[in-house]
Amino acid sequence: MCGIAGQISADPNKIAANYPAYCRMQKSLARRGPDQRGMYLHGHAALIHARLAVVDLENGCQPMVLDQGGEKYILVYNGELYNAPELHAQLAALGHRFVSHSDTEVLLHAFAQWGPDCLEKLNGIFAFAVWQQRAQKLFLARDRIGVKPLFYALRGDSLIFASELKTLLCHPEIPPQVDAHGLADVLLLGPGRTPGCGVFRNVQELKPGCCAEYTVPQVGAPRLTVRRYWKLTDHEHPDDFTHTAAKVRDLVMDAVTRQLVSDVPVATFLSGGLDSSLISAIADSHFTARGKTLQTFSVGYQDNKKYFHATHFQPSPDAPYIRTMNQFLNAQHTWVALDSEALAAALLEAVDARDLPGMADVDSSLLLFCREIRKTATVALSGECADEIFGGYPWYRDKTVRERYGFPWAQSTAYRVNFFKPEVFGGIDPAAYIDEGYRATLEQTSIRPGLDPLEQRMRQMFALNFNWFMQTLLDRKDRMSMYSGLEVRVPFCDYRIAEYLYSVPWEYKDYEGHEKGLLRQAMQGVLPTEVLWRKKSPYPKTWNPAYLNAVSAMLRSAMQDPDAPLLRIAKRAALEQLLTAAETATPWYGQLMTTPQTIAWFVQLNYWLQKYRVELV
């Protein structure tokens, strides 16, 4: 994985003059790409790259250039192609000659051969930019699921793009201004974001499954066109349950196996839950067959056993199931235990990684965890997206929550709004703002005619989770891992799994009334029975009261500063009440963000406003 950035301008003098800014942009990507740096400046184009070397360590440097068919193509790319060998063979048969075995070179030749249509052939996670020097045209693309990020901004006669917001903000033409809509996204939807919203004024994120072209004509102004090249489409499911389970098994096995390819050490996350355990078991078999030992990693918290208590969302601790998996696998396992003080301190660094207030200690713990894994491995596999695709969250199966209007993971609008001064929303009605995003997603959901109300609603639930909640988790995983110089791959995000599962009837997914029952039945024999049928438990959080004390002290300290930016938008009385309130049962967001995490989120919000010098406009 890597970091990319660049600028295309109708004025070539602007490109030459902005070289110092490009150096700052490149430096801001150093954590995403600590191994190599490259830059291409010519005429109307500046392309910037920072590399984390994973495949073909010597020959995969970027920007990569190809002269072919009278055109010169320059590529910067962040991602991995999991079908690179097949594409390499196909392109070689068409006469292409390669000098490396890097997937970067495969992608470059694929674009030269097929142009934008190459996207239909790619299986992977990616965000990339190709500059066609003679045609004076930039092509941008993002993977179907949205695993890899890509932000952009139009400024006059220029388009500026980058993997991360911090990199865009290094450019002198992109000040850290946030208007009412951007602030509403942070305060009302955070840590989620409206699809395509870059929060900062006039900054957008290229949506998953989309591509864009920016052309600099000889006469007239540059033109930007954005189009969707992939979306989930409902169709009649052709298979009975037995064939469906067999197909799911094949898809999951293939997705995991493809994503184990690397020229650097590979590890897996292992929580003792279904998803990470499946990935670890498949990877372990692959490694063992080749005489290698898999590295697995688990995260926990000091004294958590002492303070843990079961909830609707977290019914059981992870440790017993991790021990079961350790005995089952041939892997070498590492336990990572985080203390409360380090977890609280890392909240600020997690904002530096995400460039926005995030998921509080759900972010900071992952950041610290990835940092430990990076000491041993450069690549890790993780279980994100299985719950969205197979229907694993409680709100899929709780009829009351499922049928309730609004985002099922964010049912606290009135509670949220009460923390903020009314004027900060600039005339935006909070409930209407949230409703707009919810309704837009339902209107765009593909539902074939003739489905019963339950099946219709489950398509909507799939789309809501896929386009909103899952994107928040993918943002988290990308930013926290890449900030640590660790590439994390997510096999359940294989687009073939999403395409196949979208139209599978709910009665199959909910096989015998079990959450993710289809996945469990499909993977019989891969895991110990007690792990295969373990009730879902989310990413672990700390229950140690020392963490609540630490984040409460941080928020109180911030509130003692009369110039604290948080106090310009939040009500002091509401914050003080939060600091003395009992822990809430209903999460602020998702499954984990109860009172300690809400306090921590306000700490992050204050730090973000201050560190990024956010100007509210």
Where is each model-derived feature located?
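Cysteine-centered catalytic environments shared across enzyme families
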Residues: M1-A353, L366, G525, E530
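Adenosyl-5′-phosphate
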Residues: M1-I4, C23-R24, K72, A93, ...
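Short secondary-structure boundary/capping segments
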Residues: T311-Q314, A350-D352, P394-V401, V617
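Phosphate/ATP-binding catalytic cores across multiple sugar-kinase/actin-like superfamilies
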Residues: A246-T268, E372-T376, A380, L473, ...
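Short acidic/histidine-rich active-site segments
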Residues: A377-D387, G391-Y393
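A mobile, often basic/glycine-rich helix-loop segment
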Residues: F390-Y415
